[in-house]
C-alpha cells in the first residue's frame, strides 16, 4: 500500500508485484539496505538523475535506463546485485568538498503526522556531520532565481534523533526531507529533485531586520508576546510558517524584511524586531462629520458618498478576503458652533468658545461579517444625523436650529480620541479571550491639519504614551502641500505647529480615478463655484511665462545631464576617520550658524539628483521610511526639467528607496553622500537641540579602530540624532516634533525625531510606505515589546527621582514560584502586561555603563535566559516611569524606579485651578431615541496608576502587602442557564430522566470537573476515590431555605455544610485594634500567661502554635496551618506583636510572643478607663509608603474600614450586616454579630487550567462556584487571575461549555459588575432605558395593596418571566436581613438593582426601583459566540440567524413595553394568577403558556 507520510507526488513511479504505486516494499527496503555494505568486488553506478538536463552534445548514456542504478560485480555476485529504484548515492563520503561549498542533495517531503519540523536531514549526508545551532540555506537547482530556505540544526530535525521520523521514514534512503505543506508549494520544488544546501558562516548576513507574525482568534497578551518572541530567537522562519507557542498554534509568519526587502526566509536573532498583528482585533472607527462631509469633492463626488461607497466597502472587502474576525464599533461625531461669529474669522490655533459635541453610535462591537447591515445603518444615520443635532424641540410643534457643524480643522478630534481612550483606564477590564488588540481609526474629510488646545494636546499625548492602543487617521481629501498630520495650537501668544509621534495618517484615493487626471490640491471656493463661460475667468488669467535668455535650451539640458552622468567617479569603499570628523565639524558649524545663505548645488552627480532632487512635490508616504509617522514633505527644486520628468516615473514605482538606484552605494563615496545630506539642510529647520556639547563629544570620541562601512556610519549618525533629541530642553519633544514652517523642506533625518516613539519598532526599516496603510487597517499592529526610546544619562540625573527596594521570595506563594529566576520573570511579565516596554539600545547601554559602581553592559538582557539569570538586569519604561530590575549573584532581586519630575511650567498650571475643564458630551447609543449626557469625563479620566512595590511583594508571596481594594485583577463571570436538551444528552441505563434531572446531573459533573482540576503541588495517589463537594439544590425562596437550615441546627445541633461555625466569626480584613481586643478576651481569646525560660520571665505572652490554632478556628478564610502562619507573620509585620527576644519571625511552634505596647491590654498592668487609651496616633495611619519593604512595621487599621465590595457610603447602610465591618461600639456589637447565623454560599478553588503541562509555569486561576442553586435561576461561576496565559483559560472554558451542552445547559459570560455601571465604564456601549406605558405601581386597576405589599414588583417579574428572562443577581436590599448573614468567597454582593438575563444570553436587564427597565446587550457573550461561529467553514446561516435573533429580543421587548393593550391583558392575567407564596425575589414558575 502507499506510504501515508512519505510520497513522491511529482516523480514517475513503478509498480511493485502487488500492483500498488509509489511503494517502497519490504523487499526493496532490504535491497536498499544491502547497498550500504558492498563488497570490494562491487561498485554502484548511477546513470542519469531526476530532472537533470542533458549535456550540450545531446547524447545520453544508456538513455533507456535513465534514473536507474546498476550494480556491477563478479559473476557469482549475491542476489542483491540487481537493478533498483533510484537511490541517490552519498558521494560526499568519497569526495570531501570545502565546507563553504554547496552540497547537492535529493529532496523528499513528509507531512505533519510524521514530524512538525520543516526540515529533517540525514547527518550522514553532510561531510563532517552537523551540529546543533548550525544554520544552513537550501535552494533548488531547478531554477536560477529560486527561493532560499534557511533552517537551523537541532535535536528534532536530525533523522537519527527524531524517533517519529526514524520510524516513518525507515523505508526510504532520503538525505533531506521538507514538510509538504506549505513548503512544497512555496518553493515549487518537485519531489526527488536536486537541491543544494550551504552552511551560513556569518549569521549577520541572514539575520532578519523585522518579522511580522499574524494572530487570530486568540488574546495574546503582551507578556505572552515577549515569551513567544524569546522562543523564536536563534531559529529560522519562512513566509506562511505556522508557529507554535506552548504547544498551541498561535501565529503565522507573513512578512520578513532584510535590508529593506521582503525575503522568503530569515534567521531571527536577538536584534530582530518581532511585530505581532491581529486579525481579530477590536476596532473603533470614529467618523468626523464635519462641515466638509456634505461638500463636493473636486471630481464632483460628495465626501460622505466617497466614504460609504468607496472607502468602507473596500475596507470590508479586504477584511473579508483575509478572513479576519474583527469586532467593529462605528461612532459618528461632530462639534457644533453655537456662536454667531463666522469660523473663518478665527485665527490659527483658535476655536469657538461655545461648542457642543455630539456622538452617535451606529454599531457596537459587531462582527465585520455583517458588513451589509453595518453599511445600511451607516447610510441611514448619516441621512438623519444633521437633522437630529441641529433641530431643538422647544414645544410640541416648535423647533429651533442651534448652531452648525464646524469644519474639521476646528473640530473636536482630540476630544473624540480621549473619549475613546476611556476604555483603557483599567487594563484589567478587558477579559475578551478571542480578540487581542484595540485599535482606533479616525476618518475625517479634512486634510490632516487641526487646531487644538495646548493643554489638551499635551494631556492626549501623555495618555497615548501610556496605553497600547494604536491610532490611524484616514483623510478623504487630497494630500495637502505641507507636513501631515499637523496640529496647531497657541502657546505664549505664538502659533505652534507640531507633528505627533503617536498617530499615523493615510489619504484615501479611489483606485478607479485615472492616474493622468489632475486634481487641484488647494480648494478655492470662488473658483470652484464659478461657471466655465463666465467673464470673471479673465480676472484670474495668468500672464504668459517669459523665458529669460539665461535659461538653457533642451539640448543644453540634455548635454549637461550626459556630462554629469558619465563623468569619472572615484570609487571609495570606506571613509577615512579624518574625513568623517571634517564632515561632522562642518555639519556642526552649519547648525550653529543661524544666518546663512542657501547654497546652490552645482555640478551635482546626475544619478544622485534623480533621487535627491529638490523639485516641489508632495510625498506624504511614498518616500518616508516605514519606521516613522507619516510625514508629507514639500521640497523645492533647482534640478533641470529632464531629471524632474525622470523622477516622476521613479516615484510611482513600488520598490524601496534603496532599489531605485542600486549602483549608488557601490560607485559613490560616503563622503559625497554625506556632503549631499549637508547641502540639503540649507533651509531653516526646527531646532530641537538643547546644546551641541553632547554631539561634539560624541563625534570627537568616535575613533573607530578600523574603517567603518556605510551602514555603520548611517547607524552612528542616527544614534547622534537620537541623543541630540533627548538632550532637548523641551520635555514635549518626546510626544511631538515642532515644525517652524510646515511648508518648508525637511529631510528624512530631520523628521526622524517623531519616529523615535513607542511604535518605532513596529515598522520595518527602509521600506516605502503606501498612501493608504492597508496593512495597518486590515491587521493592526500590537505595541512593540521593545523600544529604543531612553533618556540620556544627563537627563536621568537631573530630571528623574530615584527609588529602590528589594524583593524577597516567599516560597509559600499563590503563583507557586520556586526560584528568584521565576519571580523575576513574573515581575517582567506583569509590567509588560500593563503596558511597559523593554528598553534596548545604545542609550541603555551607555546609561548602564556609567552606573557606579555596578554597571555592566554585558549583563543587559532583552529576553530572560532559560535557566539562570544571576547578574541579569533589564530596563523597562512606561510614560514617565523607568524600572530597572536586577538579580544579583546572591539571588536577591533589586528594583530601582525612576520617576520624571514635574516641570515648573506644569506646577504653575496646576496651582489653584484644573488644567482642563470637564468634558461630558452628548452621546446617543445604538438603540437610544435621543442624546443624553455622557456618564464619564472624557478628558480628565486617566489610566489607572499602580503601586509597583505592592505588586512585586504580592508576586513574591506577601499577599497582605497589597490592600484588598487594590486586588482588582482580571475577573470573569459566567452563568449556567437551561438550554434545549440535545439528542446525545446524558442518560442512565434503564432510567428515564426529566430535563431538569439531566441539567442537575450536568451541574454536578461540572463542579466535579472543577474540583478534579484543582492545582496540587504533588499528586497524592489514593486507593479511595476522593469525596467531592456537592451542590445543595433548593426551590422557593433563598432566605426561607437558609432559615430552615438554621432552625435544624438549633434543634438538632447538626451544622449545615453552608453554615460558618460560630467560632469562625472573623476574616482577614478585621482591624488590628479589634483583633487585639479579641485575642486578649479571657473567655474567647488566647491563654496569656507569664512564662519563664532560661531564668528569664516573660509577662503576658502566648505561644506561636496557640495563635495558629486560634486563627484556624476563628477565621473563616483560613483553611490550613500554613495559611494561619503566613497571616500571623503579616500581623507581626504590621506591629501587632513581636517575639519576646526579637530573634524570630512568627513560627508555628513553642515560641513566645508578646503584644506591642500600643495594643497590649493595659488593665493587665493597671486599671484604666478604656481600651487603648494611650494608643499612638501614628498607628491609625495606613501604610502608604510604596518604598517600605515587606519586613517593616506599618498599620492597616484604616484599610479595613471599608469593604472592597461596597461603596464608602452605602445608602442602605449595609455595613451593619458585614462581618468585616465590626464597629468600635464595644462588646455589645461583637456579641450581636456572633448571634447571627452566617452562611457562605460559594466556594473558591485554586484551579489549574494547564492540565496537560504545556506551559513552563503553573497556570492558575481562582474559580468561585455557587454551593446552592435554584434550578429556576442562573448558576454562577466566577474566575479571577493576574497573569495567567489567556489561551489556557479559553481552553478550560471551552471544555466546561462542551460538558454543559451535553446536559442541556449553556455557559454564558456576563459582566462582573452590574449593568448600571456600564455607561460610566464604556461610553459607546449600547443600552436602552425603557418605561412601561402602563405602570402597575400607580395604575388603579393593578395597584392592589395586598399584592404590592407582599411583592412590590410582582407584575414586573411576571412580565420578565413571560419574555423568558431568568434571575441573575439579587439586589443588595435582599441581603439586609438581621437574622442571617450571607457572604460569598469572592466578596460581598453589592448590586444596587436586581438583574435578569434572557435565556439565550444575549441581553441583560435591570429592574429599577421606580419600575423602569434598563436593557443592554451582552456584548462579551455575543462577540465570543460570533467569533466562534465565523471560525467554522460553513457558518453563514447560523451566524446570521443568531445575530438576528439576539437583536429581535430587544425589539420585541421594547415593542411590548410600549403596547398598552398587551400590557393590560398581561397584568390582568398576572393578577388572576396571584398567590401568596410568591416572595420578593421569586419569579412565578407556573405561568400559563
Swiss-Prot record:
Residues 1-61, 694-718, 1176-1209 are annotated as: Disordered. Coiled coil: none annotated. Residues 51-61, 1185-1206 have a biased composition (Polar residues). The keyword Metal-binding does not apply. GO terms for molecular function: GTPase activator activity. It holds the Pfam family DEP. It is found in: Vacuole membrane. GO terms for biological process: cellular response to nitrogen starvation; cellular response to oxidative stress; intracellular signal transduction; negative regulation of small GTPase mediated signal transduction; negative regulation of TORC1 signaling; positive regulation of autophagy; regulation of autophagosome assembly. Residues 708-717 have a biased composition (Basic and acidic residues). Residues 18-46 have a biased composition (Low complexity). It is a peripheral membrane protein. One of its GO terms (cellular component) is GATOR1 complex. Residues 1082-1157 form the DEP domain. Keywords: Membrane, Vacuole. CDD domains: DEP_DEPDC5-like. The keyword Membrane applies. Belongs to the IML1 family. This is Vacuolar membrane-associated protein IML1. It comes from Scheffersomyces stipitis (strain ATCC 58785 / CBS 6054 / NBRC 10063 / NRRL Y-11545) (Yeast). The lineage of its organism: Eukaryota, Fungi, Dikarya, Ascomycota, Saccharomycotina. The gene is IML1.
